[in-house]
A protein has these predicted regions:
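Glycine-rich phosphate/pyrophosphate-handling loop used in enzymes and phosphotransfer proteins
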Residues: 1-210
């Protein structure tokens, strides 16, 4: 088996549990590539998981003053290795890389069995340009289904906006017609920037009368 990132050949290691449960425990990454990704430690904002903090960050404090309680969970720090991964996966279209974090994401999503998963959508134009929704690929590779609940209108890319423009933008998400909205929803996205993105999805659900 070869590492999905660097192509290095890896030796398959069979464990007792994999033989007993007919489960494939093989990693998609070699040890060198795996070590470049950094897990979020215990020192972080309790609301958004911004790292190197022991208390609520300034952004979350501002949201709290507006009556909004940020509730976000993340697994990895967005370091250079993660930036390179998403550059290849999202922008170069290497769809095979959706499997890289499948086992990690699977273990994390198992904690939310009582929730219905909803993926943050791309606009039709962005989906046509990219060819796939990168978050849907990650969730499917982890072995989970999700609700096709939201749609998004086209807008200027977030990467071309200043921080103030991002915070002021009203993200154009809306609920698809004819769908049933569950009581407990877990919104899933790839990269956390600001809470606006998720807040606008919550508002879309609220506007639907649920």
């Amino acid at each position: 088996m070869k590492c999905l990132l660097c192509g290095q050949t890896m030796k398959a290691v069979l464990t007792f549990s994999s033989l007993l449960l007919l489960k494939n425990d093989a990693s998609c990454l070699c040890l060198d590539c795996d070590s470049t990704f950094e897990r979020i430690g215990e020192e972080n904002c309790p609301n958004c998981m911004k790292t190197d903090l022991s208390m609520k960050c300034q952004d979350c404090q501002l949201w709290c003053k507006e009556g909004v309680e940020v509730s976000h969970r993340a697994i990895f720090i967005y370091n250079q290795a993660m930036k390179d991964f998403f550059s290849r996966y999202k922008f170069d279209g290497d769809f095979l890389l959706r499997k890289v974090f499948a086992s990690v994401l699977s273990e994390e999503l198992k904690k939310y069995k009582e929730y219905q998963f909803v993926v943050i959508p791309l606009s039709p134009e962005r989906l046509l340009e990219r060819g796939f929704n990168q978050v849907e690929g990650l969730v499917e590779a982890a072995g989970f289904a999700y609700l096709d609940l939201l749609e998004k209108r086209e807008e200027r890319a977030s990467s071309s906006k200043s921080r103030s423009e991002r915070l002021e933008t009203e993200f154009p998400f809306f609920i698809k017609s004819g769908v049933t909205i569950p009581k407990k929803i877990l919104l899933i996205d790839d990269i956390y920037t600001y809470w606006n993105n998720y807040k606008s999805c919550e508002e879309a659900v609220g506007r639907s009368g649920c």
